[in-house]
């Protein structure tokens, strides 16, 4: 259960970082 939550948060963090990188590169 905790493992699923951690992996979900990890995916969310990766997505946020990717999105921020796209905006900051412009």
From Swiss-Prot:
It is found in: Secreted; Host cell membrane. One of its GO terms (molecular function) is toxin activity. GO terms for cellular component: extracellular region; host cell plasma membrane; membrane. InterPro entries: Delta_lysin. It comes from the Bacteria. GO terms for biological process: symbiont-mediated hemolysis of host erythrocyte. Its main location: secreted. NCBIfam families: PRK14752.1-1, PRK14752.1-4. Lyses erythrocytes and many other mammalian cells. Belongs to the delta-lysin family. This is Delta-hemolysin. It comes from Staphylococcus aureus.
